[in-house]
C-alpha cells in the first residue's frame, strides 16, 4: 500500500469530474490550486468538481490553495514580444511602470527595486535563465551588465539572490485569494516566498479574521532568507513545502539537495508535515515516461522522509497527467516498502511529552508484534502525527469526529483518516476502531492491532496504548 502522499496541481487538463475521479484512483491525495494562474470562477468550479467526486466515490482528498506571493516580475514589452539580450550588453530595469520595454530596458513590478539592490548584486530573470550584474543605480533605474545570451519576456519572475527584499508577506491579490479560500473552506494554504516568522503570523491573522482559523499554513521556502530563518518559520507554520524551483535559482543548485534533507529532517522531528515539490517528473509534461534521474529523485525524497511528493505542470498542463500520477504512485509504493521505522532519533534524549512517549511506545509495540495497523483517536491530528514521526511499518488509521482534521490528515504519510460521528468513551473507541479496521481491509480477523487513545477521548492528552486481537 502507498504511504507517501501525492499532491497534484489541477489545471485545464485535469479539472473535469471524470478526470479528477481517475486521478484519485491513480493515487492523488491532495488537489493543489495554483493562484498564480486562473480566476475565482475556474478555481471554484475545480473545488466543486472534486467535492462532487468525493461524495460520489466516498474517497477523501484535501484541497490546497497555493498563493502567488510577493514576487517581482518584468512588465510590458513592445508588442508583447520577447527581446534578445546579448552577453556583455548594458540592460536597465526601471520602477517607472509606464515604461514599455525593449531590448535595452524593462519596468519591474516592485517599487523598492532601486533601494534594496547595491552595485555588484546579481539579478536573475526567468528562473535564472538570464543573469545580470548591477553596475550602477541612478534614480529609479538599476543599470546592469548582461552575463549570458537569452530571451527576455514580459511577466517573467525576477530573483535577487542573497538580497533581503522589503516586499510585504501578503500582496493585495494574496489577501483576496485567502478570503476566497476561507469562503470555499480549503484545507491548506501554501504560502509562497516565506522569509521570516512574522510573514506566517501575518497570514494566520488574515485567515483568522475571515473565518479560516482552522486552515493549515504550509510555508514555502524559496530563498536564502527563508533558509536562514528556517527554525522560526517552522515553529510558526503547520508544515513546509520544499519549493525547489525558486530555491534552486536563489541558492547554488548543488546546495538544493542538502537544504531539502535538512528541512525534511527538521519537519519530522517537529511533527510537521512536509511536501517535496518542483520538477519531480518534469519530463513527463511532454513524454509518457520519466527519466531515470527523475524516478530516483522521487524515491530519494521519500527515503529522506517526506510526507508528500508533488506534481506541478505534469498534472496541470502536461500531455500525460494520469500516467504521471500512476508512475509517481508506483515509485511511492515501491520505496515505502523498504522504509524502516525510525525509533532511534539521534540526539533525541530530551524527556518526551506524554503524548509523544505513548505514541512512540505504540510504534515500538506494533513493530515487535508485527501489527499491520495502529488505530489512533485524534481530535486535531496531533496524536496521529506523533505516531507518524516514527515511520511505523503499520498503517495508521486515524479516527476523528472533526471533518477538517480528517481532510488535513490526508497529507500525512502513512495515515488513513476516517471521519466518525462520535466517540463516547474509550470502550466505544475500541469497538469502533476494530470494526473500521476490518471494514477498511487494513487488517483482518486474527490480526494484532495497537490502539492509541486519551483519557478524555474528545480532546486532551493521549495517554493509553493497548493491544487487541481482531
Curated annotation (Swiss-Prot):
Reported effect, residue 413 to Q: Partial activation of enzyme, loss of cooperativity in fructose 1,6-bisphosphate binding
Annotated site, Transition state stabilizer, chain positions: 220
Binding site residues for K(+): 34, 36, 66-67
Obligatory cofactor(s): Mg(2+); K(+)
GO biological process, alphabetically ordered: glycolytic process; response to heat
GO-annotated cellular components: cytoplasm; cytosol; membrane; pyruvate kinase complex
Enzyme Commission number(s): 2.7.1.40
List of residues binding ATP: 34-37, 73, 156
Mutagenesis / variant outcome for changing residue 271 to L: Loss of an interdomain salt bridge, stablilizes the inactive T-state
Sorted UniProt keywords: Acetylation, Allosteric enzyme, ATP-binding, Glycolysis, Kinase, Magnesium, Metal-binding, Nucleotide-binding, Potassium, Pyruvate, Transferase
Pathway connected to this protein: Carbohydrate degradation; glycolysis; pyruvate from D-glyceraldehyde 3-phosphate: step 5/5
Any Pfam family: PK
Keyword ATP-binding among UniProt keywords: yes
Molecular function per GO: ATP binding; identical protein binding; kinase activity; magnesium ion binding; potassium ion binding; pyruvate kinase activity
Signal peptide stretch: none
Binding site for Mg(2+): 222, 246
Domain of life according to the entry: Bacteria
In-chain residues carrying the UniProt-annotated modification N6-acetyllysine: 76, 319
Catalyzed reactions: pyruvate + ATP = phosphoenolpyruvate + ADP + H(+)
InterPro entries cross-referenced by the UniProt entry: Pyr_Knase, Pyrv/PenolPyrv_kinase-like_dom, Pyrv_kinase-like_dom_sf, Pyrv_Knase-like_insert_dom_sf, Pyrv_Knase_AS, Pyrv_Knase_brl, Pyrv_Knase_C, Pyrv_Knase_C_sf
Activation and inhibition: Belongs to type I PK; fructose 1,6-bisphosphate-activated.
Function, in words: Catalyzes the formation of pyruvate in the last step of glycolysis, it is irreversible under physiological conditions. The reaction is critical for the control of metabolic flux in the second part of glycolysis.
Family: Belongs to the pyruvate kinase family.
Subunit structure: Homotetramer.
Protein name from the UniProt record: Pyruvate kinase I
Organism: Escherichia coli (strain K12)
Gene, per the UniProt record: pykF
Amino acid at each position: 500500500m502507498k504511504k507517501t502522499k501525492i499532491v497534484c496541481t489541477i489545471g485545464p487538463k485535469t479539472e473535469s469530474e471524470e478526470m479528477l475521479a481517475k486521478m484519485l484512483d491513480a493515487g492523488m491525495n491532495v488537489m493543489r490550486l495554483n493562484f498564480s494562474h486562473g480566476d475565482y470562477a475556474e478555481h471554484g468550479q475545480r473545488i466543486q468538481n472534486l467535492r462532487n467526486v468525493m461524495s460520489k466515490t466516498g474517497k477523501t482528498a484535501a484541497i490546497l490553495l497555493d498563493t502567488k506571493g510577493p514576487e517581482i516580475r518584468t512588465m510590458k514589452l513592445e508588442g508583447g514580444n520577447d527581446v534578445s539580450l546579448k552577453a556583455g550588453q548594458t540592460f536597465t530595469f526601471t520602477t517607472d511602470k509606464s515604461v514599455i520595454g525593449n531590448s535595452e530596458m524593462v519596468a519591474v513590478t516592485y517599487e523598492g527595486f532601486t533601494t534594496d539592490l547595491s552595485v555588484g548584486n546579481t539579478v536573475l530573470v526567468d528562473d535564472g535563465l538570464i543573469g545580470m550584474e548591477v553596475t550602477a543605480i541612478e534614480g529609479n533605474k538599476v543599470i546592469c551588465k548582461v552575463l549570458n545570451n537569452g530571451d527576455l519576456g514580459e511577466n517573467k519572475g525576477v530573483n535577487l539572490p542573497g538580497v533581503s527584499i522589503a516586499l510585504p508577506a501578503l500582496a493585495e491579490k494574496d489577501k483576496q485569494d485567502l478570503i476566497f479560500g476561507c469562503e470555499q473552506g480549503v484545507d491548506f494554504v501554501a504560502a509562497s516566498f516565506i522569509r521570516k516568522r512574522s510573514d506566517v503570523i501575518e497570514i494566520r491573522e488574515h485567515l483568522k479574521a475571515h473565518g479560516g482559523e482552522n486552515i493549515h499554513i504550509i510555508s514555502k521556502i524559496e530563498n536564502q532568507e527563508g533558509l536562514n530563518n528556517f527554525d522560526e518559520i517552522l515553529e510558526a507554520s503547520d508544515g513546509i513545502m520544499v519549493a525547489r524551483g525558486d530555491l534552486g535559482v536563489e541558492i547554488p543548485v548543488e546546495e538544493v539537495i542538502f537544504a531539502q534533507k535538512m528541512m525534511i529532517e527538521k519537519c519530522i522531528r517537529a511533527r510537521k508535515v512536509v511536501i517535496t515539490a518542483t520538477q519531480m517528473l518534469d519530463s513527463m509534461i511532454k513524454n509518457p515516461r520519466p527519466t531515470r534521474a527523475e524516478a530516483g529523485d522521487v524515491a530519494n525524497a521519500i527515503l529522506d522522509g517526506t510526507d508528500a511528493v508533488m506534481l506541478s505542470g505534469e498534472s496541470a498542463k502536461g500531455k500525460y497527467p494520469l500516467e504521471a500520477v500512476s508512475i509517481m504512485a508506483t515509485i511511492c509504493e515501491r520505496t515505502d516498502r523498504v522504509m524502516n521505522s525510525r525509533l532511534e532519533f539521534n540526539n533525541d534524549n530530551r524527556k518526551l511529552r506524554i503524548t509523544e512517549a505513548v505514541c512512540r511506545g505504540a510504534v515500538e509495540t506494533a513493530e515487535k508484534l508485527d501489527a499491520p495497523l495502529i488505530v489512533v483517536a485524534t481530535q486535531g491530528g496531533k496524536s496521529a502525527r506523533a505516531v507518524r514521526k516514527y515511520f511505523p511499518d503499520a498503517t495508521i488509521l486515524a479516527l476523528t469526529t472533526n471533518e477538517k482534521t480528517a481532510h488535513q490528515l490526508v497529507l500525512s504519510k502513512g495515515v488513513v483518516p476516517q471521519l466518525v460521528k462520535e466517540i463516547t468513551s474509550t470502550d466505544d473507541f475500541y469497538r469502533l476502531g476494530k470494526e473500521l479496521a476490518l471494514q477498511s481491509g487494513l487488517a483482518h480477523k486474527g490480526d494484532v492491532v495497537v490502539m492509541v487513545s486519551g483519557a478524555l477521548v474528545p480532546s486532551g492528552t493521549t495517554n493509553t496504548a493497548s493491544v487487541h486481537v481482531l
